[in-house]
């Protein structure tokens, strides 16, 4: 059985109820639909209820990855997953099979009934996409201030509910100037919430990039870091974020492919949750064993794990997943990593330690 941590299951990535201007799906050439930029079209009706074709594929993907890897974490993301009819029932059914079920959403369709049902499951980590609490900061995600207020009102209900939550805050030339205000607004929600700012990325990201004179804002926040607690990520995360901007890109290693991979609802598998342009195989349409065996065992996988990034996509990449790399590199402790919502479960902690120990034992043998 492979010693991995998480499957990032992407369901209908082009089906969304927002049109974020920097959306990576619209920039992706991974699938024909991405080339057509369907992400900017109106959301479509779909169904993952028991007996549907989509549900059959999802069940197959989860079965294969669970049986062959015993993963403690499943992350379910889109698109916007709650556009899919039957999604809440699917989450309720699969949650008991994992130590942690991560649910990534923009929050617009998450009502009180959903929150109560998610909280009842007891092992949910919400990941909410929000660039800032003001319209100015969130403008690339909201077409107008009225829409932003509607979105933030719904998010306020989510943040107040107490479910462990990570806020994914994309840093761009509109959100970074407002970041201090955003952090001050969010710290009221308490210890169940963590904020993870990370740089906008992708081939079309230049127009959204943080301006050079905005970068010192990150160091200003660093100098008063404790004033934004308890919602801040581990300190090493902020240090690495500042380094990314000051060095104009990634110059440090990435260990993410040692921990996680991506599956799409059509069965395709990729080596890294942050890179969608490399297909390992398909666990729905192909024989399963060779595809599973290829996860972590391809030349492309080794390129991703180079001491310094070799691909342009990697050089421009820094995401909340980077806490895993910091753990492997000794920049944060296991306790610090497991203080964040996604990694708190005991079974997750155990798997993290296993992967860490296995890697460093191998490194000793190579010396």
Residue ranges of each PLM-predicted region?
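Radical SAM enzyme [4Fe-4S]-AdoMet core and its adjacent flexible, acidic
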Residues: 31-37, 41-49, 97, 129-131, ...
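Processing junctions and N-termini across compartments
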Residues: 10, 14-17, 248, 307-311
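Flexible mid-to-C-terminal extensions adjoining Fe-S/redox cofactors in radical SAM and related proteins
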Residues: 1-7, 26, 30-35, 274-367
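Conserved alpha-helical substructure of the radical SAM core
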Residues: 1-121, 366
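Short cysteine clusters
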Residues: 16, 20-23, 254, 272, ...
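Short, conserved active-site loop motifs that form the nucleotide-linked donor/cofactor pocket
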Residues: 123-124, 191
